[in-house]
């Protein structure tokens, strides 16, 4: 099809979203349906996640707009859709939200490349074919900055950085393709940091990365738990999922956001040590006065009692000692006056801890065999999705 955009008809938006029914994806869909009662949302769903998606779709009936599930996969030509389905999207879609990606740190490079880079290329093809496209919203990650230290600006991408894992590397290459496409497409890029549970309820579908610090503290039978890996002075930048959804929805409809990149981060993050101390206080634990070096922490993580962390999760804990400061000037500028602002972690940390504690308590009640606190994660879904494959993104 031609890349020439036709003028969008004066109707409610028609949305296409990848990464459903994952952690962020399902919340974004619900937000769209509530905020725009006349909207029609197409959600791309992998076959293995169709049942879960159908259950969620049934719960969302009556919330406002309409949700239509399309079975497919971003790695396939035309996203695995039939010719009729693909043509329907091309004729109707006004907004695309591309969330699906593999984020699991231990994923083989070929798999990560196929999903994160080739999958993004396929979504770009759809965007070029959409006759009424108003916006392609791409979910990247702050971690495309790799091993860079210091202040990192939103308009920076390729600064000669090295990458610590294939997730960072493949998301970097995917964003490069997105940025090149922005010359001819109305694109907005979002780079969230680590997304945690809802700031009001603490609810989250997955426990990974920084959450493992909290889980080890909350559920540890030891009065004095494991010391914090490293000195803990680096900022632990996390954002609640409800903030991410509201910010993305608002910015994706702001014409000033076209062609720009937005760090979805806490503008004033707490240090990793302070977060660890606050969680310890809530768990009635006394922290050791000494720190572990990164190497000593890695050795301790290999002990049998902690082996459930596994190599990918040990790698994730390395982020707590990474002194990167993500500037969010663009985000603050465009959200100014909207009432949407990332809440400080201190204001909702108690809810996150309480949710972890309650999930662990319920898990222990369901099975007396569960002795390992790190066994409490539910099976991964798809926008963080996948099981046979490693989890896919947001």
Where do the model's predicted regions map?
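N-terminal Rossmann NAD(P)H-binding glycine-rich loop of SDR-like oxidoreductase domains
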Residues: 8-38
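Amphipathic terminal alpha-helices
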Residues: 14, 36-39, 327-394
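NAD(P)H-binding glycine-rich loop region in Rossmannoid oxidoreductase-like domains
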Residues: 67-118, 128-130
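Conserved Rossmann-fold NAD(P)-dependent oxidoreductase catalytic core, especially the SDR/UDP-sugar
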Residues: 97-99, 106-114, 118-166, 188
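A conserved pocket-lining segment of Rossmann-fold NAD(P)-dependent short-chain dehydrogenase/reductase
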Residues: 108, 201, 210-243, 247-251
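Active-site Tyr-X1-5-Lys
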Residues: 125, 149, 161-193, 198
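Glycine/proline-rich active-site loop of Rossmann-fold NAD(P)-dependent oxidoreductases
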Residues: 198-211, 251-262
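Terminal hydrophobic/aromatic helix or amphipathic segment near a protein terminus
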Residues: 272-322, 342-345, 361-371
């Amino acid at each position: 099809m031609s890349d020439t955009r036709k003028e969008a008809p004066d109707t409610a938006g028609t949305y296409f979203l990848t990464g459903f029914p994952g952690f962020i994806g399902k919340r974004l869909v619900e937000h769209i349906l509530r905020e725009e009662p006349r909207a029609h949302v197409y959600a791309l769903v992998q076959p293995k996640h169709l049942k879960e998606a159908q259950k969620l779709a049934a719960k969302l009936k009556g919330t406002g707009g309409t949700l239509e599930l399309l079975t497919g996969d971003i790695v396939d030509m035309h996203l695995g859709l039939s010719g009729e389905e693909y043509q329907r999207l091309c004729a109707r879609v006004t907004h695309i939200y591309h969330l699906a990606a593999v984020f699991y740190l231990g994923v083989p490079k070929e798999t990560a490349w196929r999903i994160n880079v080739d999958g993004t290329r396929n979504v770009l093809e759809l965007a070029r074919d959409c006759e009424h496209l108003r916006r392609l919203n791409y979910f990247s990650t702050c971690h495309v900055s790799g091993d860079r230290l210091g202040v990192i600006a939103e308009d920076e991408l390729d600064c000669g950085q090295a990458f610590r894992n294939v997730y960072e590397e493949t998301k970097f290459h995917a964003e490069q393709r997105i940025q090149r496409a922005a010359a001819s497409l109305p694109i907005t890029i979002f780079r969230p940091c680590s997304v945690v549970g809802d700031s009001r309820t603490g609810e989250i579908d997955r426990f990974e990365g920084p959450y493992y610090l909290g889980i080890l503290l909350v559920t540890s039978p030891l009065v004095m738990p494991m010391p914090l890996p490293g000195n803990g002075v680096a900022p632990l930048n996390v954002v609640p999922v409800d903030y991410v959804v509201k910010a993305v929805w608002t910015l994706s409809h702001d014409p000033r956001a076209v062609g720009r990149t937005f760090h979805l981060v806490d503008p004033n993050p707490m240090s990793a040590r302070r977060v660890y101390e606050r969680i310890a206080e809530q768990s009635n634990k006394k922290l050791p006065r000494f720190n572990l070096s990164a190497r000593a922490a890695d050795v301790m993580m290999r002990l049998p009692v902690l082996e459930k962390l596994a190599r990918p999760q040990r790698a994730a804990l390395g982020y707590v000692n990474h002194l990167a400061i993500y500037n969010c000037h663009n985000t603050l500028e465009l959200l100014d006056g909207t009432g949407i602002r990332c809440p400080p972690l201190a204001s909702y940390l108690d809810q996150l801890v309480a949710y972890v504690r309650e999930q662990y308590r319920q898990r222990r009640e369901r099975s007396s065999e569960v002795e390992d606190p790190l066994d409490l994660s539910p099976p991964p879904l798809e926008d963080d999705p996948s099981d046979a494959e490693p989890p896919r993104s947001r």
